[in-house]
UniProtKB/Swiss-Prot annotation:
Its cofactor is Mg(2+). It comes from Ralstonia pickettii (strain 12J). GTP binds at residues 31-38, 58-62, 82-85, 149-152, 188-190. The keyword Cell inner membrane does not apply. Gene3D superfamilies: P-loop containing nucleotide triphosphate hydrolases (3.40.50.300). The keyword Translocase does not apply. This is Probable GTP-binding protein EngB. Residues 23-209 form the EngB-type G domain. The gene is engB. Necessary for normal cell division and for the maintenance of normal septation. Keywords: Cell cycle, Cell division, GTP-binding, Magnesium, Metal-binding, Nucleotide-binding, Septation. Belongs to the TRAFAC class TrmE-Era-EngA-EngB-Septin-like GTPase superfamily. EngB GTPase family. PANTHER family: ENGB-TYPE G DOMAIN-CONTAINING PROTEIN (PTHR11649:SF13), MSS1/TRME-RELATED GTP-BINDING PROTEIN (PTHR11649). It holds the Pfam family MMR_HSR1.
Length: 233
C-alpha cells in the first residue's frame, strides 16, 4: 500500500509567513477551479474526503497541507500541498489579487517544493492561467507533471491527440531554459481510475518515500570475465 494512502490533514495557511518551518519535501497540486484538483488528490490518496472542494468555485483561498508518514511516525516524510484553484471569472478582484501573490510567491520561492503537479481539463489544457503557473515555476528547474484530468470525457483518438499536443507544448517550454528539466504529462480520469498508479509513482518519487526507493530498478551485478588461465573442466 502506498504511503500516500495514509496522508492526513496537517494545516491550513493563508499567508506565506505561516508556512510550516520544516525541511521535508513538498509536492504541490495546482489547477483551475473546475479542473478536478480535489477529486484527483483524494483518488491518489485513496480517500474520499481528504481534500475538499468548495461548492462555489473559486472560494477556496487557502493553502492546505497534508502530511505523509507511516501511522505511528512522529514526523512527516513529506507534504502534499493543495493550492487554491485559480481562474474563476466571478471571483472578486481582491480574491484574484490574493491568488496571484499567494500562488506565484509560493511556487517561485518555496525551497522545500520538490515538484509541481498541474491539473488541466483534458478538453481545454494550457489555458492562459495554466501557462502562467508553468512560467512561474519553470525557472526553478524543478519538475512539473501535468495531469490531463477528465480524460474519460474524450474519445480514445481525441485523448491521444490531447496528450500529443500537451507534450509538444511542454517540449517548447523545455527548449526555453538551460539545463535538463523534467516536464511530463499523462492522461488521468478519476471516474475511470485511469493513470492513478503512474501519478502515484511520480509523487512518491518526488517525496523520496520508501516505496519509491524500493521501486527503483536494481543494477545487474557485473558478470565476471573468465581468466584466460582459468582451468577448464
Amino acid at each position: 500500500m502506498s504511503l500516500l494512502h495514509q496522508a492526513r490533514f496537517f494545516i491550513t495557511v493563508n499567508h506565506l509567513r505561516d508556512l510550516p518551518a520544516t525541511a521535508v519535501p513538498e509536492v504541490a497540486f495546482a489547477g483551475r477551479s473546475n479542473a478536478g484538483k480535489s477529486t484527483a488528490i483524494n483518488i491518489l490518496c485513496n480517500q474520499k474526503r481528504l481534500a475538499f472542494s468548495s461548492k462555489t468555485p473559486g472560494r477556496t483561498q487557502h493553502i492546505n497541507y497534508f502530511s505523509v508518514m507511516p501511522a505511528k511516525a512522529e514526523d512527516p516524510l513529506g507534504f502534499l500541498v493543495d493550492l487554491p484553484g485559480y481562474g474563476y471569472a466571478e471571483a472578486p478582484g481582491e480574491t484574484k489579487s490574493h491568488w496571484v501573490h499567494l500562488l506565484g510567491d509560493y511556487v517561485k520561492a518555496r525551497q522545500q517544493l520538490a515538484g509541481l503537479v498541474i491539473m488541466m481539463d483534458a478538453r481545454r489544457p494550457f489555458t492562459d492561467l495554466d501557462c502562467q503557473m508553468v512560467e512561474w515555476f519553470l525557472p526553478t528547474g524543478k519538475p512539473i507533471h501535468v495531469l490531463l484530468t477528465k480524460a474519460d470525457k474524450l474519445t480514445n483518438n481525441d485523448a491521444s491527440r490531447a496528450l500529443m499536443a500537451a507534450r509538444k507544448v511542454l517540449a517548447d517550454y523545455r527548449a526555453q531554459i538551460d539545463g535538463d528539466v523534467s516536464l511530463t504529462v499523462q492522461l488521468f480520469s478519476s471516474l475511470k481510475r485511469r493513470g492513478i498508479e503512474e501519478a502515484q509513482r511520480i509523487v512518491a518519487g518526488w517525496l523520496c518515500l520508501p516505496e519509491a526507493l524500493e521501486a527503483e530498478p536494481q543494477a545487474e551485478p557485473a558478470k565476471k570475465t573468465p581468466s584466460p588461465n582459468a582451468q577448464r573442466g
